[in-house]
Amino acid sequence: MKTCNLTDRMKVKMIMLLFQILAISTLQSDSAYIPDRYTQENVAVRGKATQSALASGGGAVLSLPGYAIDGNRDSDSSHGSCSHTTNGPNPWWRVDLLQVYTIASVTITNRGDCCGERITGAHILIGNSLENNGINNPQCSTVGIMTAGETRTFHCSRPMIGRYVTVYLPKTEYLQLCEVEVNALLPAN
C-alpha cells in the first residue's frame, strides 16, 4: 500500500477546492443563492483580526480589531463592540481566517453612534497574500454610502478563494467596523 506524501495531499486538496469552485460557479452576485449541498457560514469568528493602527487616547481599549469579529452587531462604539483605527492615510483592517475558504460575500455593520459616512469608498479584498497588508489581493466589492448603524451584505461578483479578508479605505480617515462577517460556502453534512 502506497502512503501519501505531503505533495499528494496538497494535490488532493487542490482538486477538492477546484470541484468546490465548479460546484458553486452558478452563484449570482446579486442574490443570496446557495447551491444545493452547501451551507453559508460566517467563518470570521474563528479568525484573528489586525488593523493598521489603534485609535489613540482613552478610547483605545474600546477599539481593538477583534471586536469586529466577535459575533456582536452592536453598532455603538462606546460599548466596546467596534474596531477603530486612527485618523490616517489609507487605514485597513484584516482578518486571517486561518485557512483558505470559498467566500461568497462579506457583511459589514457600520458604526451607529456617529460618523456613518466614514466607511464610504472602502474596498473589500480577498486573497492569500499578505503583501502590502493584503491590499494587493483581488477586490470583492466596494462599500458605497452606508447609514450609521446599517448592516449590509456585499456579494462578490463570483465566489472568491482566500484566507485573508481586508477592508481598505483609500483616503485619510478613520476606519470603524462594528462587525465583519465573512460568508463562506461550506459543503453541507
UniProtKB/Swiss-Prot annotation:
> One GO CC annotation, please?
extracellular space
Indicate where this protein resides in the cell.
Secreted
Q: Which GO terms describe its biological process?
A: regulation of cellular defense response; regulation of complement activation, lectin pathway; regulation of innate immune response
What the entry lists under Pfam families is as follows: F5_F8_type_C_2 (PF22633)
For the motif Cell attachment site, give the residue ranges.
Answer: 111-113
Q: What residue stretch is flagged as signal peptide? A: 1-31
Q: Which residues bind alpha-L-fucose?
A: H84, R111, R118
Q: Which InterPro entries match?
A: BG_Antigen-Binding_Lectin (IPR051941), FTP1 (IPR006585), Galactose-bd-like_sf (IPR008979)
Keyword Secreted in record: yes
The cross-references to Gene3D superfamilies, in alphabetical order and at most eight, read: Galactose-binding domain-like (2.60.120.260)
F5/8 type C-like: region residues: 40-189
Give the UniProt keywords, A-Z: Calcium, Disulfide bond, Lectin, Metal-binding, Secreted, Signal
Instruction: Spell out the note in the miscellaneous section.
Output: Binds 1 calcium ion per monomer.
Q: How does it assemble?
A: Homotrimer.
Protein name in the entry = Fucolectin-5
Question: Which source organism?
Answer: Anguilla japonica (Japanese eel)
